[in-house]
Amino acid sequence: MELLIHRSSAIFLTLAVNALYLTSSQNITEEFYQSTCSAVSRGYFSALRTGWYTSVITIELSNIKETKCNGTDTKVKLIKQELDKYKNAVTELQLLMQNTPAANNRARREAPQYMNYTINTTKNLNVSISKKRKRRFLGFLLGVGSAIASGIAVSKVLHLEGEVNKIKNALLSTNKAVVSLSNGVSVLTSKVLDLKNYINNRLLPIVNQQSCRISNIETVIEFQQMNSRLLEITREFSVNAGVTTPLSTYMLTNSELLSLINDMPITNDQKKLMSSNVQIVRQQSYSIMSIIKEEVLAYVVQLPIYGVIDTPCWKLHTSPLCTTNIKEGSNICLTRTDRGWYCDNAGSVSFFPQADTCKVQSNRVFCDTMNSLTLPSEVSLCNTDIFNSKYDCKIMTSKTDISSSVITSLGAIVSCYGKTKCTASNKNRGIIKTFSNGCDYVSNKGVDTVSVGNTLYYVNKLEGKNLYVKGEPIINYYDPLVFPSDEFDASISQVNEKINQSLAFIRRSDELLHNVNTGKSTTNIMITTIIIVIIVVLLSLIAIGLLLYCKAKNTPVTLSKDQLSGINNIAFSK
């Protein structure tokens, strides 16, 4: 009867989830803005992690000493092999404990201090650990150091004398207890007794008292199943150097996870949200190796607390917007760089530029505020008016018109330039649309794939409403001669300022050139005038000379009487 109830509940839950998915996806709307080559997908709701909840899980172990399983029977060999695995796992955990983040005091946030602690402690390790594992450990810590700081702080306290016994005593008569640790932090602790009870009450009596005579294979299978959790936990901690994510079902079973969620100090809506999205919760959770002592394996489980839920969220998709009326190789391009997830949060907007860090389940967006930037609500104006005066919208510029496509929630943005062939296709009808040069958008209704050159994109098949907002591409407002290229982290105002600087420089150059030309013209006029004056003077002098010469030549010669006499005639004198 109980199984039937569980199956009925599971079927009901599945139907409810499917109904929720269909209903929520139909509420998604998408607006494409032709002027900026961008699209906004709306209709999502937030689940933002704002804190962490830490709990301590303890797995009680058995002290297995020498066993009497030395027979040749297959079942005996299997039991002995499984017992050896158990003891090896315990030994591996004991060695690993000396190299955990808590043991080596790596709970600080700063990356340089993480590195110093890691280098110093790995030098002094007496445990033989490969260099590959050390590098992986260091890199992992640098990546998640801030996220797991609270969990490591709890894990460190468990290394203090008496802390494990304090937890054991609190769990003597119950499987759960709130324990106040030495640092003043109270944590919920849970114990797992399945493995210890099976070994002590079922397995060891057979092994030691009956000389390991096993009558059926079921005993072997039962022990393997019981032992698998410890072996897998050991493997995960060993491979991941003591810190694992996501949270596996070996670290915390589904029933244990749901029970832990129910005990968290959060609202019923938050509990309902987490309980219905356990896979997302696991992806954003951590388990941290702490200590193995007093026949107890203790590790910390760190779960996300979603402090902001049910506020509107939207996703911005952007693609390059380039000119198309200029010869090939001379086009200019502009791309919005503010793509990502946005969620309303206490009067402002939480912006998640790395959209892949957010997980989407139907219309619910699970994001970590550690990966967010806080922006004013005016940032939304960039979608409808990129030149608005209240928020400086972010863009990048280039002079490389690369064709590409961006898959959105309800369609695809296609940036098609040059000689690239861009098409949209239906799996049954083939190509149904060929895109011309420029930025365009296609809905997923009747479209299965988008092809840009040799690249094929599959569109999402969510249902919703599409809106195509037409407008003049803003790139056409810019002059290619003064448009700044390769501005990878800029804004509209910065680009416009550089354009104004370029225009001012051009105007100044024109003025200088004009002044130079004016000076040259004046000089030329003066030189020409001087030359003309000189020529006129020379011509005047020549004219006067000629006039005097001609006048002198035309005057008759008159002789005196003495000159005409024979005596005084010079012609006869000698």
Curated annotation (Swiss-Prot):
Q: Which InterPro entries match?
A: Fusion_F0_Paramyxovir (IPR000776)
* Ranges facing Cytoplasmic side: 551-574
**Single GO BP term:** fusion of virus membrane with host plasma membrane
- What are the boundaries of the signal sequence? 1-25
Q: Which stretches are transmembrane?
A: 525-550
The lipid of kind S-palmitoyl cysteine is covalently joined to 550
Organism domain of life: Viruses
Q: Which residues are glycosylated?
A: 27, 70, 116, 120, 126, 500
Q: Which SUPFAM superfamilies match?
A: Virus ectodomain
Intervals, Extracellular compartment: 26-524
At what residues does the UniProt record annotate the site feature described as Cleavage? 109-110, 136-137
Q: Spell out the GO cellular component terms annotated for this protein, sorted alphabetically and separated by semicolons.
A: host cell Golgi membrane; host cell plasma membrane; membrane; viral envelope; virion membrane
Outline the segment boundaries, as ranges, of region: Fusion peptide: 137-157
Coiled-coil regions, chain positions: 76-96, 158-209, 481-516
**Keyword vocabulary terms for this entry:** Cleavage on pair of basic residues, Coiled coil, Disulfide bond, Fusion of virus membrane with host cell membrane, Fusion of virus membrane with host membrane, Glycoprotein, Host cell membrane, Host Golgi apparatus, Host membrane, Host-virus interaction, Lipoprotein, Membrane, Palmitate, Signal, Syncytium formation induced by viral infection, Transmembrane, Transmembrane helix, Viral attachment to host cell, Viral attachment to host entry receptor, Viral envelope protein, Viral penetration into host cytoplasm, Virion, Virus entry into host cell
Q: Which cysteines are joined by disulfide bonds?
A: 37-439, 69-212, 313-343, 322-333, 358-367, 382-393, 416-422
The Swiss-Prot or TrEMBL record describes its family as follows:
Belongs to the paramyxoviruses fusion glycoprotein family.
Entry protein name: Fusion glycoprotein F0
| Gene that this polypeptide is encoded by | F
